[in-house]
Design a protein with these regions (language model features):
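Short, basic/aromatic recognition patches
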Residues: 1-14
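Short helix-to-loop capping/linker segments positioned immediately adjacent to catalytic or ligand/cofactor-binding
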Residues: 3, 18-22, 104-109
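Covalent nucleotidyltransferase core used to form phosphodiester bonds in nucleic acids
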Residues: 4, 39-43, 47-52
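Short beta-strand segments
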Residues: 11-45, 59-63, 72-75
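Short, structured beta-strand-loop surface elements
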Residues: 46-124
Length: 125
């Protein structure tokens, strides 16, 4: 039996919806990898989604296309910010999943001494 975690972890893109202070949803299509019972996303530490997750970890996730068109119903989840070391592991996992596209992102991310961030996402049962 395929679980929502299986579907989301295998998706090419994940629609990660965070929420502003006033409750306004902010959907963002992102690459995703599965790590055990958690989904993981790599991002820049100054991204708006990081700021919103820092304030409240309440998010919704759904599989989507490259431009963010959902391919399924949203699932409630809790997001947490991971360490920079975890961000490096997430970036390596993205290379494994996305091949050349992932390598290009890793190359750009590792140029210079730019900080990295990762988000861990746990589905709410």
């Amino acid at each position: 039996m395929t679980t929502p975690l299986d579907v989301l972890g295998q998706a090419d893109y994940l629609l990660l919806t965070t929420f502003k202070k006033d409750g306004t949803p902010v959907p963002t299509p992102v690459w995703v990898v599965r790590h055990g019972d958690e989904l993981r996303v790599w991002t820049a530490p100054d991204a708006g989604k990081v700021k919103r997750i820092r304030r409240s970890g309440k998010v919704q996730v759904a599989p989507c296309g490259m431009r963010g068109k959902p391919h399924g119903s949203p699932v409630d989840a809790v997001a947490t910010l991971l360490s920079e070391e975890d961000a490096d592991q997430v970036l390596d996992a993205l290379v494994q999943k996305y091949g050349l596209r992932g390598r290009m992102v890793r190359w750009g991310a590792r140029r210079g001494d730019r900080p990295r961030a990762a988000i861990g996402i746990t589905l709410v049962s």
